[in-house]
């Protein structure tokens, strides 16, 4: 049996841009992608801490070191600049893998710079 498990999480990042007329997606600073082990075009689930919205889209790379978290297309209706988000990726794992798996959690500062990387639960 396969279980769908939390793989990685960007915790409480701040939305820096929302562009309704872009094709779609979520732009994420490459430093954050590397820290979380996330990849461009990977499906993500987003949880808006500010307004309670939950939605999904896919990742595109934003400039390294920019602190950018940009919501594009329809996703731009789900959050405003300044909102706090939790961004998660999930993946299938065997029973054996899931028994010992620890998701990667990236905590950020107010400028969306990596503050701490840890395995969850701490």
From Swiss-Prot:
A molecular function GO annotation: aspartate 1-decarboxylase activity
One annotated GO biological process: pantothenate biosynthetic process
Residues holding substrate: 57, 73-75
Enzyme Commission identifier(s): 4.1.1.11
Residues where Pyruvic acid (Ser) is found: 25
Cofactors (names): pyruvate
SUPFAM superfamilies noted in UniProt: ADC-like (SSF50692)
Assembly and interaction partners: Heterooctamer of four alpha and four beta subunits.
Descriptive protein name: Aspartate 1-decarboxylase
Organism per entry: Bordetella parapertussis (strain 12822 / ATCC BAA-587 / NCTC 13253)
Gene: panD
């Amino acid at each position: 049996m396969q279980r769908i498990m939390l793989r990685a999480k960007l915790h409480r990042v701040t939305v820096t841009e929302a562009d309704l007329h872009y094709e779609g997606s979520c732009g994420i600073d490459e430093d954050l992608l590397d820290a979380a082990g996330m990849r461009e075009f990977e499906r993500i689930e987003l949880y808006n801490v500010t307004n309670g919205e939950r939605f999904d889209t896919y990742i595109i790379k934003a400039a390294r070191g920019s602190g950018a978290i940009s919501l594009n297309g329809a996703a731009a209706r789900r959050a405003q600049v300044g909102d706090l988000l939790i961004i998660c990726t999930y993946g299938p794992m065997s029973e054996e893998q899931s028994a010992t798996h620890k998701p990667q959690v990236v905590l950020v500062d107010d400028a969306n710079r990596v503050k701490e990387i840890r395995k969850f639960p701490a």
